[in-house]
């Protein structure tokens, strides 16, 4: 499989859950996942452990989680680049997001009873992080007070 074909398949798979959230949610996910190289590079470089509980601070509508779930699905189906490390296997995907509209879009995309995904409305400056193995903060670091 050509790299561009693989990335298109991954993008299609990761964007699909957001169709239920409307045009904005879907097109936002596609735009974000296709234009921000961090999503591709965390997989290509194997930056996450093989299995992990994730916490994404300022997670928005959960685009990273959709990306990780889609990656694992393609990997398990054998549709994965031979020169890339295995896709990580999420054990739990927890997000903290300040904006309720993003939390609502995530609930539309993943459903209320998703076995791995839980996105809650809250302030990442005061939230209990729990005990995840991986903490990500994409596009939200500037919301942390440096004190």
Whereabouts are the PLM-identified features?
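Class I SAM-dependent methyltransferase Rossmann-like catalytic core
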Residues: 11-45
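Conserved class I S-adenosyl-L-methionine
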Residues: 52-60
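A short, conserved alpha-helix within the catalytic core of class I
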Residues: 144-147
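Conserved SAM-binding strand-loop segment of SAM-dependent methyltransferases
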Residues: 113-124
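Conserved SAM-binding loop
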Residues: 106-107
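Conserved SAM-binding loop of SAM-dependent methyltransferases across substrates and taxa
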Residues: 61-88
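Conserved SAM/SAH-binding beta-strand->alpha-helix loop
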Residues: 99
